[in-house]
UniProtKB/Swiss-Prot annotation:
Glycosylation (residues): N143, N174, N258, N354, N507, N550
Range of residues in the leader sequence: 1-17
Protein name: Probable extracellular serine carboxypeptidase
Source species: Arthroderma benhamiae (strain ATCC MYA-4681 / CBS 112371) (Trichophyton mentagrophytes)
Main location per the UniProt record: membrane
Positions of the catalytic residues: S188 (charge relay system), D466 (charge relay system)
Length: 716
């Protein structure tokens, strides 16, 4: 039963092929489906019940954007699996994104979340996004209520979650960040979210994997169809382009009402507006996004569409009787010379659309016009608690854009959807539902880095054939990058939308499934996350006691002679700050200080600023033109990048670390004022260069061994 439910939930998440403009009937069905899922979630998912944590509705009480402010909290839902957990393991959070969290639950058992939790002895978590599923901060979806649905508020939710979470049944462990490593995973919109979280809250999140992450908000996202045009089966693409030519030549260029009427009647859509008609015809090609390597969850519509429109046989006897009308339409659309070839293709398209769409509409008691219409001002004005469809349009109308048009394609490109699908049409929902008449303020998203976003332990995994690729760091317009363990940058060939996310149970695998490229990518993700865990350091904010967390729990254990210096305390609750301990003999303090100082010198030599990146809100300032790194390269930050650490900042970081070491081993009772500098210097210690990083690790191990007599435990 659990496996069947998991399959169904994944199927729902995968096969929802989105038209450029979602018809009202689908918006209504989406709200009903969400309500039903929330109502029966506890029964269906008994193995993984929903839990809640109270989150502030408003994280920014000083911002005028959210006036009037509120101090209230709401229940945000999450699910977790601790079956792989061992003390010291990380918390792996899969960000729920712009959908109900129920659709992500199968990833607790199979897929990348389960794999990472198993590889690191961690806890797998699914965290729902505010205003989706059952995580509703407000009693309705009115504009006034939706003012709290913004990117920055959603990011702050996740940060609050990680700093305050207490998992039921695991209360004896302190599993909050940053004491426990919290690592994020997200796909698509959620992929953008986790990338932003790593750069905006680097002191909370130890790492993140952004899969098919959209980090660049684009208002007119005509590029959505470029990977389809370039990567989908070319015979299918060519036939689709011919159909689009015919439709646009008749409706846009021909302006003959009789021919337009005959074209629409051929498809049984005579009463639809022109743009709604063109939108309905795009339902086949837009199914590309829902394809997946796993046949059990892959959308079937795309390949059914392609198989039928590329056939030279008449597959539907009923539509074959309309040859005369279809031939006139082909000729009026400028493809008369190709009529013998296009005729069966066009009539098969008519038959396919009737079978895949119109029969479904009639089965629901709707006419084609009711089913495919996107104009209904009365519907759009509804904003009660049942109108959950309003959440994502609110986000893209205000901040993200992503209006998928055919009109935006350059003139030298034969589009795969009609140019009738333009900005006025795709933005109509913004105007009718929310009264928004201006383009989305994409700067509110792009300020986080857009194409240039980059950070230590921030991985990007994309599909080479993903329609959303052009909105992420692998876009044609983005700069080229290399890949490393510290900054993985992976493009999966012939993969579509976050194909690395789902997986199979062991008894479901075959020689062909998962495909080798998927197995390799998921294995690589597990590898570099384990490597990230090896250098996890946390200096306790309250006690400044370094807590070793993770190394002995990895599959590749440390040598036995190293472990005595890395024994984790059972609890830090009553730990005594090393700065408050009085050494029994002053010589111990002196030798400890000297040893710690020597380790800092070693680290300073090995870890000089080769491409350092400072955490956000750190001590670094804009480097002057005279500043160069030790390789003689100019230190100047790229647009959108975190500020490059200057030599001065690096020296300050090491000085603060040295002062911390001194105060920890001598008699200074209060070093609260040094807390910020110490925490910042810890990040500066770590170079992007693997050899230097190794040297850093050795220097801290050296310090740990020197200070064993003082019971100072260092976490690496």
């Amino acid at each position: 039963m659990v496996k069947l439910t998991a399959c169904l939930l994944l199927l729902v998440a995968a096969v929802q092929a989105k038209l450029p403009v979602t018809p009202i009937s689908q918006l209504r069905a989406e709200s009903h489906r969400n309500k039903a899922l929330v109502a029966r979630s506890q029964d269906v998912n008994a193995a993984f019940p929903a839990h809640t944590i109270q989150i502030p509705i408003d994280h920014f009480p000083k911002s005028s954007r959210y006036e009037p402010h509120t101090t209230e909290k709401f229940n945000l839902r999450y699910w977790f699996d601790a079956s792989h957990y061992k003390e010291g393991g990380p918390v792996i959070i899969l960000h729920g994104g712009e959908t109900s969290g129920e659709g992500r639950i199968p990833f607790l058992q199979k897929g990348i979340l389960a794999q990472l939790a198993q590889a690191t002895n961690g806890i797998g978590v699914i965290m729902e996004h505010r205003y989706y599923g059952g995580s509703l901060p407000t009693p309705d979806f009115s504009n006034k209520s939706l003012r709290f649905l913004t990117t920055e508020q959603a990011l702050a939710d996740t940060a609050y979650f990680s700093k305050n979470i207490k998992f039921p049944g695991l209360e004896k462990y302190n599993l909050t960040a940053p004491g426990t490593a919290h690592i994020l995973y997200g796909g698509s919109y959620a992929g953008g979210q986790v990338a932003f979280l790593r750069t905006q809250y680097p002191d909370i999140f130890w790492g993140a994997i952004s899969s098919s992450g959209v980090t660049k908000a684009i208002y007119d996202y005509w590029q959505y169809f470029e990977p389809i045009r370039q990567e989908a089966p070319q015979d299918c693409v060519h036939v689709t382009q011919n159909f689009v030519d015919i439709v646009d030549n008749i409706i846009i260029n021909g302006k003959n009402a009789n021919t337009t009427r005959e074209l629409k009647n051929l498809f049984g859509l005579g009463r639809l507006r022109d743009a709604d008609f063109a939108n309905a015809l795009s339902s086949g090609i837009t199914g590309w996004q829902s394809t997946n390597w796993d046949p059990a969850i892959s959308g079937k519509s795309f390949y059914q569409y392609c198989g039928e429109i590329t056939s030279d046989r008449y597959l539907y006897p009923v539509t074959a009787q309309q040859k005369a009308s279809a031939k006139r339409i082909i000729e009026a659309g400028g493809h008369g010379r190709e009529a013998p070839e296009i005729l069966p293709q066009l009539l098969n398209f008519v038959g396919w659309l009737n079978k895949s769409t119109l029969e479904s509409c009639s089965g629901q008691g709707q006419t084609a016009e009711e089913c495919l219409n996107s104009y209904d001002e009365a519907f759009y004005k509804q904003d009660n608690a049942d109108q959950s469809w309003r959440a994502w349009p609110w986000q893209y109308c205000n901040e993200w854009g992503y209006l998928q048009t055919g009109s935006g394609a350059p003139k030298n490109i034969r589009p795969v959807i009609s140019r009738l699908i333009d900005l006025p049409y795709t933005s109509n929902i913004c105007k009718q539902a929310f009264g928004i008449t201006k383009p989305s303020n994409v700067d509110l998203v792009n300020k986080y880095g857009a194409f240039d976003i980059e950070y230590d332990r921030l991985a990007f995994v994309d599909g080479g054939s993903d329609p959303w690729k052009e909105a992420g760091v692998h876009a044609t317009a983005a700069r080229k990058r290399g890949t490393s363990t510290n900054k993985p940058f992976i493009l999966i060939p012939d993969a579509v939308h976050h194909w690395d996310e789902n997986g199979l149970y062991p008894n479901e695998t075959t020689a062909e499934l998962p495909p080798q490229r998927i197995k390799e990518v998921q294995a690589e993700e597990a590898r570099f996350v384990k490597e990230w865990m090896k250098v996890h350091i946390y200096i306790d904010h309250q006690t400044f006691t370094g807590i070793r967390k993770n190394l002995s729990l990895m599959n590749d254990e440390l040598p036995a002679h190293v472990l005595p210096f890395l024994v984790p305390p059972t609890s830090t609750k009553n730990a005594v700050s090393p700065s408050h301990e009085q050494p029994a003999d002053p010589r111990i303090a002196i030798s400890s200080w000297a040893c710690a100082g020597l380790s800092v010198v070693v680290a300073r030599i090995c870890c000089s600023p080769i491409g350092y990146r400072c955490p956000s809100r750190d001590l670094a300032a804009q480097p002057s033109k005279s500043k160069k790194d030790r390789r003689g390269q100019q230190l100047s930050p790229a647009a959108g990048d975190p500020i490059v650490c200057t030599g001065l900042t690096t020296r300050l970081g090491f000085v603060s670390f040295l002062v911390f070491a001194f105060s920890s081993f001598t008699f200074i009772p209060d070093i609260e004022t040094l807390k910020a500098a110490v925490l910042r210097s810890g990040e500066v210690l770590w170079s992007h260069d693997a050899a230097a990083e190794c040297c850093c690790v050795l220097s801290v191990l050296f310090a740990a061994s020197c200070t064993e007599s003082r019971k100072l435990r260092l976490d690496i």
